């Protein structure tokens, strides 16, 4: 089946359509890489937020508990072997 000659504007053997598809592919790859970078940035923000909201207050609470209960740091020289 051949394409009607009356509808052919330029006989370029598909060069224009090929270039359009390559540009679309490049644009899609650029958009995908931008989305991937945004996902990585979101993971970093969540990690920092988790550390700020959960880990640092828990560490402060544990330090306060250690000071209140007078728990000393582990010293291998003072450890008793039973």
Curated annotation (Swiss-Prot):
Membrane topology summary: Single-pass type III membrane protein
Localization: Host Golgi apparatus membrane
Keywords for this protein: Apoptosis, Host Golgi apparatus, Host membrane, Membrane, Transmembrane, Transmembrane helix
Superkingdom, taxonomy of origin: Viruses
Ranges facing Virion surface side: 1-19
Keyword Transmembrane: yes
Major location category of this protein: host cell
Subunit structure: Homopentamer. Interacts with membrane protein M in the budding compartment of the host cell, which is located between endoplasmic reticulum and the Golgi complex. Interacts with Nucleoprotein.
Name the record gives this protein: Envelope small membrane protein
